[in-house]
Amino acid sequence: EKSANEVGLKSDVIRYPDSVEEKTVLDKIYELNKDNSVSGILVQLPLPKHIDKQKVIEAILPSKDVDGFHPMNVGNLSSGYESSIPCTPLGCYLLIKKIEPNLNGKKAVIVGRSNLNGKPMTQLLLKENCTVTITHSKTKDLKGECLKGDIIVAAVGIPELVKGDWVKKDAIVID
């Protein structure tokens, strides 16, 4: 909220106790969907266990889905259409593009297959004509896969998983 205000954006934070009923959350989302003064909705994950995360995500209008988690936005991103993009992969992508504007033909290794980071990052790099290999913490010879990458993005929630000797000279690494 503070960061939004600092850059001139209006932001309202709606907090609920962990005991909140799913219906209460869904009703608020439906209300915000109808409100033309609301341009975006972001639901802080994880949700309490008794609330169906997918139901909540799907209740948000795709046009107001700040995180890019709605199935329509996920599908649009993977099909190359305009969509909301999750902020972490988008930030990584913009950083990579600042370092190397021409990604055409680069070999990218994504360590992580989550819907939040790994899969969207893969789609963004595929759109740039990278050859993308998706790996994860259980990949056999992860070091060998990483050594092939011109770009390595580690997004598995394990700090410093990618070691220095896993990276070839001049590779771009985001961990």
What spans do the regions from the language model cover?
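Glycine-rich phosphate/diphosphate-binding loop of Rossmann-like nucleotide-binding domains
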Residues: 1-2, 18, 83-172
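Anion-binding alpha/beta catalytic cores of soluble intermediary-metabolism enzymes, centered on
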Residues: 42-107, 121
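A short acidic, often aromatic-flanked loop/helix-cap motif at beta-alpha or helix-coil junctions
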Residues: 19-22, 76-77, 141
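N-terminal ligand-binding/catalytic initiation module
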Residues: 1-40
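Short, hinge-like loop/turn segments at secondary-structure boundaries
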Residues: 30-31, 59-60, 150-153
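Short, surface-exposed acidic/glycine-rich loop or hinge patches that mediate macromolecular interfaces
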Residues: 16-19, 46, 50, 140
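Redox-cofactor binding/interface segments in oxidoreductases and associated redox assembly factors
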Residues: 40-43, 154, 175
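Conserved strand-to-helix beginnings and helix N-cap segments that scaffold or border functional pockets
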Residues: 25-26, 53-54, 146, 164
